[in-house]
């Protein structure tokens, strides 16, 4: 952000060491700016504490929001108040060292905010477009590395240039009572940084969200089509059913592993089964759903496998005769926190009364899996995340666009933008940090409820709030 383009355009003039505002105007500006700063600080602290105390908010996407809240908190504490001081008294009273430190902090934090938004957009894009491969790589460690990279890169890009430019060129040209970045005295540099720091990221984020929206709509249509197909009569020997399966478990589940359970006489036993089953047809389903395939296996092979695998501490070899083994492979697209990932479960059914018993058990499973599909599921966590991302992207674009439009105009016409308009435009960039926590609360009921519990000091069971 170019926080002193207007001041830079008039830096050659004599600086009046008195406030350009009347006393009543100064009081009004201080009250409004101070209130915005306070709301920004409280709001972003609430975001950070909510993610810390509520385990349902401890997802990869919310860790990115935590990083964004850190940047917004710094803006609320330092940037807003120092810029208010600079505005109301009409000059910079704290000296060149504090000036450069403030500018470095302001630009590093602002750039980190933009990079966090880019990370969030790319993360959601890969979640939606690569649901089978990306969630495996999407770990807390990876998220931490991406967040660290965003902050380190922002620091490298801005801090050294702001702090040491005067030594590189052989002297400081910024007046003592002014505060702006020295290398922004060149309009071409100002124009280029505006393109790189705002317009290019906005274009990338807009394209990504458009792709996310398209992919989400395509998956919804696919899910509806599969749901309609699952209403057809079902044969117990080949079943493909669908259930709505809300999954709030944030612990990553291996997509390669198979859970083996034995169902004997319609009841599940705790024995480990080592035999191999004939793999049935698998059918991918939409988000938060399960595909079920039931395929009867070879009786002779199954009996041989049973003899080799049934081990019990309390029983000798248990021989099951005149029975057939059916393998049901359930392919579930469960959510790893806020991103879909497929998991497999193999259930083995051993019927003691031949085909009739086996078919009865299979029909029960089919009935169990198809019943929840009749109910309208609540909004999935994926939809909440996508909605939150849309809100913060819109807030970012709306609040940052006016200032960056003025930057482009100022590159060609230094006297075309009034000082008051510059100040308002720059303050809008700061207000984005105030709006972000409200976006989280409005788009995510869990954030909203946790905020409420924290503000009302209701700490009991706050960690399990949904």
Swiss-Prot record:
Extracellular domain ranges by topology: 1-25, 84-100, 166-187, 411-418
PROSITE patterns: G_PROTEIN_RECEP_F1_1, G_PROTEIN_RECEP_F1_2
Motif (Important for signaling): 123-125, 436-440
Glycosylated sites: 2-3, 8
Bilayer topology: Multi-pass membrane protein
Subcellular compartments: Cell membrane; Postsynaptic cell membrane
Topology feature Cytoplasmic, residues: 49-62, 123-142, 213-387, 443-466
One Gene Ontology CC term in the entry: dendrite
Cystine pairings recorded for this chain: 99-179, 413-416
Classification via Pfam families: 7tm_1 (PF00001)
Compositional bias ranges of the Polar residues kind: 228-238, 246-256
Protein family membership: Belongs to the G-protein coupled receptor 1 family. Muscarinic acetylcholine receptor subfamily. CHRM2 sub-subfamily.
Note: This receptor has a high affinity for pirenzepine.
Protein name: Muscarinic acetylcholine receptor M2
């Amino acid at each position: 952000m170019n926080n002193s383009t207007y001041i830079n355009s008039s830096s050659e003039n004599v600086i009046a060491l008195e406030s350009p505002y009347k006393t009543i105007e100064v009081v009004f500006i201080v009250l409004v700016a101070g209130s915005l700063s306070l709301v920004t600080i409280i709001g972003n602290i609430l975001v950070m504490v909510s993610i810390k105390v509520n385990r349902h908010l401890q997802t990869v996407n919310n860790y990115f929001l935590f990083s964004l809240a850190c940047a917004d908190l710094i803006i609320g504490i330092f940037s807003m108040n120092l810029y208010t001081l600079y505005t109301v008294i009409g000059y910079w009273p704290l000296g060149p060292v504090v000036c450069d430190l403030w500018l470095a902090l302001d630009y590093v934090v602002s750039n980190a905010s933009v990079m966090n938004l880019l990370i969030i957009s790319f993360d959601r894009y890969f979640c939606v477009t690569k649901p089978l491969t990306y969630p495996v790589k999407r770990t807390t460690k990876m998220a931490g590395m991406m967040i660290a990279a965003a902050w380190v890169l922002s620091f490298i890009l801005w801090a050294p240039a702001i702090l040491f430019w005067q030594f590189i060129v052989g002297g400081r040209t910024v007046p003592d009572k002014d505060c702006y970045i020295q290398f922004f005295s060149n309009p071409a540099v100002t124009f280029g940084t505006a393109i790189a720091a705002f317009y290019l990221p906005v274009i990338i984020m807009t394209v990504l969200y458009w792709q996310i929206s398209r992919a989400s709509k395509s998956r919804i249509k696919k899910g509806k089509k599969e749901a309609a197909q699952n209403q057809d009569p079902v044969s117990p020997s080949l079943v493909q059913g669908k259930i709505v399966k809300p999954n709030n478990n944030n612990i990553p589940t291996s997509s390669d592993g198979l859970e083996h359970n034995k169902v004997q006489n319609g009841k599940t036993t705790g024995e480990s089964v080592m035999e191999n089953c004939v793999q049935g047809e698998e059918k991918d389903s939409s988000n938060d759903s399960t595909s079920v395939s039931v395929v009867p296996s070879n009786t002779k092979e199954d009996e041989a496998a049973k003899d080799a695998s049934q081990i019990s501490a309390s029983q000798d070899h248990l021989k099951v005769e005149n029975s057939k083994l059916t393998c049901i492979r359930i392919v579930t697209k469960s959510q790893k926190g806020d991103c879909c990932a497929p998991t497999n479960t193999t259930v083995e059914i051993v019927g003691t009364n031949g085909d009739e018993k086996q078919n009865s058990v299979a029909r029960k499973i089919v009935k169990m899996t198809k019943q929840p599909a009749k109910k309208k599921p609540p909004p999935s966590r994926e939809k909440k995340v996508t909605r939150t991302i849309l809100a913060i992207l819109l807030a970012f674009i709306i609040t940052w666009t006016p200032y960056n439009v003025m930057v482009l105009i100022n590159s060609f016409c230094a006297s075309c933008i009034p000082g008051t308009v510059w100040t308002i435009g720059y303050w809008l960039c700061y207000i984005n940090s105030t709006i972000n926590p409200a976006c989280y609360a409005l788009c995510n009921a869990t954030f909203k409820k946790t905020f409420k519990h924290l503000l009302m000091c209701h700490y009991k069971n706050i960690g399990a709030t949904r």
